[in-house]
Amino acid sequence: MSNEYDYLFKLLLIGDSSVGKSCLLLRFADDAYIDSYISTIGVDFKIRTIEQDGKTIKLQIWDTAGQERFRTITSSYYRGAHGIIIVYDCTEMESFNNVKQWLSEIDRYANESVCKLLIGNKNDMVESKVVSTETGRALADELGIPFLETSAKDSINVEQAFLTIAGEIKKKMGSQTNANKTSGPGTVQMKGQPIQQNNGGCCGQ
């Protein structure tokens, strides 16, 4: 993989266990789907490079790999994140009700300027759907963040989800860069946050 890129964005996938975070990551990074995806305890991440507006963006996407079941997600997971995707299961109301709890975690640990995206996954399971599109969108509107419904299984809106949050981060960084030009040196850009390339603790597949 080439090391040539204009931006390096750290993205997080958070949400209740079994909402399909690992499946979304696998679909976007490898264009694959495993129905019985089993996460090991740890933190897994995958990398994919995309092109957007003539810029090369390297996305480093982190998955909690089962830690959310034990509430062991720590501040180190959120540190340096540019974007966070909050995922719920369209067929599981409890996972939707817990979204605000995850948002409070973000507020507690993440950078206040972090970009957020709300995703309702498993949208292909129409007959089992209990969280309507309107309900999901209403919450996203209340929070002032983008919203998409996805299906990792049928590859619906998965690509669009990651492109959307990458675009939001790039747009925010552009506005910060302009602010830096007017305010002079000494301001800190999101791009300046170091990201450790640590391949340890990858979840087994």
From Swiss-Prot:
GO function term, MF aspect, one: myosin XI tail binding
Domain of life: Eukaryota
Effect of N121I: Inhibits trafficking between the ER and Golgi. Causes severe dwarfism and seedlings death
Biological-process GO terms, alphabetical: endoplasmic reticulum to Golgi vesicle-mediated transport; protein transport
Entry annotated with the keyword NAD: no
GO cellular component, one term: trans-Golgi network membrane
Functional summary from the UniProt entry: Protein transport. Regulator of membrane traffic from the Golgi apparatus towards the endoplasmic reticulum (ER).
NCBIfam families: small_GTP
Protein name: Ras-related protein RABD1
Taxonomic source organism: Arabidopsis thaliana (Mouse-ear cress)
Lineage start: Eukaryota, Viridiplantae, Streptophyta, Embryophyta, Tracheophyta
Gene that encodes it: RABD1
